[in-house]
């Protein structure tokens, strides 16, 4: 049996990276491959830890300091110390940070790992800082990783050196989901809406860590415009994060407190997605969001920014708007597209697009074992 260390460049929470790897972990042949999880920072999702333990894995956290810009010193120090004490042949690194992928790969190879995988899950801000970090990281990303994985071509181009892209030395691993657990069900929808006391509401939904990338600030502006036009609207926010307090203050300031459900971390994602009417994801950047695929699997229309790669599996349920559009224009477009939409089961469309987790988990297992 092969033991794989899954290294995260951010805290372990309920984000897309965690969702992706847990979908793989639940469906991979655990007689052949087992996972351990490591973060140089902390884990704020106890249910995640419990499930990992139940599947045979371990979670290691070093309690380092983390902010939305990352903490390079703690990342290097804590990962280095951990790998001096724990040895793995295969180390798989996940991060939204090019720095974490590059320096994590170096530390992993220096520890004696034979296979070091860097995995790009998203894009980012194309500014001077990004260009500088990519230039400085390129030598490490060419020298130390043995394998390069990405959720989309855009995510690969964003993180990996041009040589890797040109020579196609990377694998695309789709952000696949379990279609047996994520589907539209009218009974689940009615039951969940009743439990949340939103039976007669127009429910705008969002799942994501409260971080700069997810652009909650603009999301609140969009919802504010929606509720002006549809008075019975509510906004459902699922997640936690460093900017949660700041967003809560904005909600209170706009007088939206009674119209926003802040549900923190939840494990009943299928139920909550079924309860929603639309899903809005105005991120500054994404690779291919797991939550977008999950939303479409439950028949939701997904309204997202052009910062998200145009690879969501069900094209007819995907709407991409520039962040240059005003919040009012976003709101108008969302209400216009929703009007007359009849929700349906999209399970077969998801499978046909190659997003079935059984197939993806088998591919990942083969990549680990070869």
What do the PLM-derived regions correspond to, one by one?
Residues 183-198:
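A short helix/loop element that forms part of the nucleotide-sugar donor recognition site in Leloir-type
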């Amino acid at each position: 049996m092969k033991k794989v260390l899954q290294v995260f460049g951010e805290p372990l929470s309920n984000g897309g990276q965690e969702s992706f790897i847990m979908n793989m972990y639940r469906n991979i042949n655990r007689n052949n491959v087992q996972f351990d999880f490591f973060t140089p920072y902390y884990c704020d999702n106890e249910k995640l830890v419990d499930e990992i333990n139940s599947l045979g894995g371990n979670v290691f956290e070093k309690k380092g300091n983390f902010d939305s810009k990352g903490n390079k010193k703690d990342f290097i120090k804590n990962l280095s110390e951990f790998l001096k004490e724990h040895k793995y042949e295969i180390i798989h690194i996940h991060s939204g940070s090019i720095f974490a992928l590059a320096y994590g790969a170096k530390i992993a190879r220096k520890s004696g790992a034979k296979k070091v995988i860097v995995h790009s899950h998203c894009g980012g801000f194309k500014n001077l800082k990004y260009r500088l970090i990519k230039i400085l990281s390129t030598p490490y990303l060419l020298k130390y990783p043995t394998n390069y994985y990405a959720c989309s071509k855009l995510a690969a181009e964003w993180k990996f050196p041009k040589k890797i892209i040109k020579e196609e030395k990377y694998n695309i691993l789709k952000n696949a989901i379990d279609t047996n657990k994520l589907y539209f069900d009218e009974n689940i929808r009615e039951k969940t809406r009743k439990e949340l006391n939103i039976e007669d509401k127009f429910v705008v939904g969002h799942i994501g860590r409260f971080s700069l990338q997810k652009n909650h600030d603009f999301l609140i502006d969009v919802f504010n415009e929606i509720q002006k036009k549809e008075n019975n609207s509510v906004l459902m926010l699922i997640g936690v994060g460093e900017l949660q307090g700041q967003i809560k203050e904005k909600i209170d300031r706009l007088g939206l407190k009674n119209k926003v459900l802040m549900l923190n971390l939840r494990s009943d994602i299928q139920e909550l997605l079924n309860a929603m009417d639309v899903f809005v994801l105005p991120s500054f950047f994404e690779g291919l969001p797991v939550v977008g695929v999950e939303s479409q699997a439950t028949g939701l229309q997904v309204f997202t920014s052009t910062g998200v790669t145009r690879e969501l599996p069900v094209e007819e349920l995907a709407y991409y708007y520039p962040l240059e559009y005003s919040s009012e224009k976003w709101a108008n477009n969302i209400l216009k597209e929703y009007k007359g939409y009849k929700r349906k089961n999209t399970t077969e469309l998801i499978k046909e697009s190659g997003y079935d987790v059984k197939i993806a988990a088998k591919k990942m297992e083969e990549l680990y074992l070869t």
